[in-house]
């Protein structure tokens, strides 16, 4: 026994409306991405048409060609307007679906697998830290060495002055 064609049509229509309700956010995002790509493509075509159009600046032009290009341009603009409305609907629907969700940081969504490169980076960081510590110590030792050299120079100057005074006294005595 077959169902009447009208009943089949209404059953198919109910299935389609149910499927339309069950569209998930990921497929909406894909539809939005395709819509954006269509918008970019149409915009590029509009610029191509505008670039190829000749302005009526005294040069003979064919009115039919001009009207044809103008018609194409207007059709592209209408299509672009429809695509932007479609994109707005997809955007609103995505926001509606995601309204109750809390944003999850992207770091938590990406699984972390420790690999050799992270170990290598840790080793390099440790070596860098050790090298900078060693350099700091060398700079400290150089600073202390300069201070000690200054002190030795002062002592040598004092000894030289003392020896000169002793020699002067001995010379006066003799």
Curated annotation (Swiss-Prot):
Give the organism the record lists: Danio rerio (Zebrafish)
Give the UniProt keywords, A-Z.
Answer: Activator, Coiled coil, Nucleus, Transcription, Transcription regulation
Query: By its UniProt entry, which InterPro entries does this protein fall under?
Result: Mediator_Med30_met (IPR021019)
- Its family? Belongs to the Mediator complex subunit 30 family.
Please name one Pfam family that this protein belongs to: Med30
State the Gene Ontology terms under molecular function. Answer: transcription coregulator activity
Give the multimer and partner information: Component of the Mediator complex.
Localization, UniProt = Nucleus
Q: Name one GO biological process term.
A: positive regulation of DNA-templated transcription
Q: Which residues form a coiled coil?
A: 113-166
A GO-annotated cellular component: mediator complex
Q: What does this protein do?
A: Component of the Mediator complex, a coactivator involved in the regulated transcription of nearly all RNA polymerase II-dependent genes. Mediator functions as a bridge to convey information from gene-specific regulatory proteins to the basal RNA polymerase II transcription machinery. Mediator is recruited to promoters by direct interactions with regulatory proteins and serves as a scaffold for the assembly of a functional preinitiation complex with RNA polymerase II and the general transcription factors.
Q: What is the residue range of the signal peptide feature?
A: none
> What is this protein called in UniProt?
Mediator of RNA polymerase II transcription subunit 30
């Amino acid at each position: 026994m077959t169902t009447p064609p009208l009943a089949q049509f209404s059953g198919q229509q109910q299935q389609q409306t149910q499927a339309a309700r069950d569209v998930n956010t990921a497929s909406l995002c894909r539809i939005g991405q395709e819509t954006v790509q269509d918008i970019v493509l149409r915009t590029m075509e509009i610029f191509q048409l505008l670039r190829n159009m000749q302005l009526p600046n005294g040069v003979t032009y064919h009115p039919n060609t001009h009207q044809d290009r103008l018609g194409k341009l207007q059709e592209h603009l209408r299509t672009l307007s429809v695509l932007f409305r479609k994109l707005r609907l997809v955007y609103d629907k995505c926001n509606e679906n995601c309204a109750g969700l809390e944003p999850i940081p992207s770091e938590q969504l990406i699984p972390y697998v420790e690999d050799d490169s992270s170990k290598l980076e840790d080793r390099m960081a440790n070596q860098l830290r050790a090298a900078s510590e060693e350099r700091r110590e060398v700079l400290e030792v150089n600073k202390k060495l300069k201070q000690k050299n200054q002190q030795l120079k002062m002592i040598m100057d004092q000894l030289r002055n003392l020896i000169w005074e002793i020699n002067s006294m001995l010379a006066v005595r003799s």
